[in-house]
Design a protein with these regions (language model features):
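N-terminal helix-turn-helix
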Residues: 30-64
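Periplasmic-binding protein-like
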Residues: 76-78, 163-179, 249-276
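Short, Lys/Arg-rich nucleic-acid/phosphate-binding segment
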Residues: 64-77
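Short helix-initiation/N-cap motifs at beta->coil->alpha
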Residues: 121-132, 215-229
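Conserved hydrophobic residue
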Residues: 25-30, 60-61, 139, 233
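Extreme N-terminal segment that seeds HTH/winged-HTH DNA-binding domains in transcriptional regulators
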Residues: 1-33
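A ligand-binding cleft/hinge motif common to bilobed small-molecule-binding domains
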Residues: 143-156, 226-258
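Mid-protein regulatory/catalytic core that forms ligand/cofactor-binding pockets
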Residues: 89-204
Length: 276
């Protein structure tokens, strides 16, 4: 490869990396110092300066404030996107089966479309399936609960939490639902269904059933409630909002574990460090 070609390749790759980083910045933000970017991208100072100059000529404006650094005074994320090397932004989230998820789906779609970015959202049940898609490079981000995120990040250090949304952004609460409307607690010998691919349901089920002699049944998340309604199992951990809409008379009891239960109601966006 000729020297000029090698230099242009370095400029191009640095421009991709810088544009991807700038996608997370907004007006008023201070950008990293040149020396910091040189160390991060492992290229020369001149290469970073050339890439930054290209972005500033077409997509953003900086104000230099001496030793305080440079601040963004204007930025066109749609134009920045053109330099990222990315195509359509693809996210994945659960089916919007409750009011929290319906609102979240609308908010995410509206926000990204407002930025004029090419975008598609895939709706897919179970955090494990969504995270597997993220790890395989099929998705750029996935929506899971904070409870699921903790499990995913421990298992997959290449993932990172990009955004944590407010309380109630994922759902309102889970309950223990019983096929017997008079039942109020889990007991030895009960049949309990859960989806092993649903980190929330799995963790809450195991926690609630700890110390009890329980017969477990594995099935897709949405099938657990259907199975409960028709007497196939005695209990499931399910979203209170969805269980309350059941046309069958079900018993319901609160989950007596505040910490994991509270983490299950926060929505989190996970991304891969290897994608940026």
């Amino acid at each position: 490869m000729k020297a000029n070609d090698s230099y242009r390749l370095k400029i191009g790759l640095t421009l991709n990396n810088l544009a991807r980083e700038m996608m997370t910045y907004h007006v008023g933000d201070r950008i990293p110092a040149i020396t910091e970017l040189v160390e991060r991208y492992q290229v020369s100072r001149g290469t970073v300066q050339s890439a930054l100059a290209q972005l500033c000529s077409e997509a953003m404006t900086l104000k230099k404030s001496g030793h305080l650094g440079s601040y963004i005074t204007a930025i066109n994320h749609r134009k920045i996107w053109e330099y990222t090397g990315w195509n359509t932004l693809i996210g994945a989230m659960p089916l919007p089966s409750n009011n929290s998820l319906k609102g979240l789906a609308t908010a995410l779609t509206t926000s990204i479309e407002y930025a004029q970015l090419p975008f598609n959202m895939a709706f897919m049940q179970s955090a494990q399936n969504r995270v597997n898609g993220l790890l395989a490079g099929r998705f750029d981000f996935v929506v899971v609960s904070r409870l699921s995120a903790d499990v995913c990040l421990e298992k997959n250090p290449q993932l990172t939490m990009a955004v944590e949304l407010p309380r109630g952004s994922y759902n309102k609460s889970h309950v223990i639902a019983f096929s017997n409307p008079k039942e109020t607690r889990l007991r030895d010998g009960m049949r309990v269904a859960y989806d092993p691919c649903s980190y929330d349901q799995t963790q809450l089920t195991r926690l609630c059933c700890e110390g009890l002699n329980i017969q477990y049944f594995h099935m897709p998340y949405r099938s657990t409630l259907h199975c409960l309604e028709h007497g196939g199992v005695d209990a499931v951990i399910y979203l209170k909002e969805s269980a309350a809409r059941s046309t069958h008379r079900l018993g319901m009891a609160p989950i007596p574990y505040e910490d994991p239960l509270s983490k299950a109601i926060y929505a989190v966006l996970l991304t891969s460090k290897e994608n940026y």
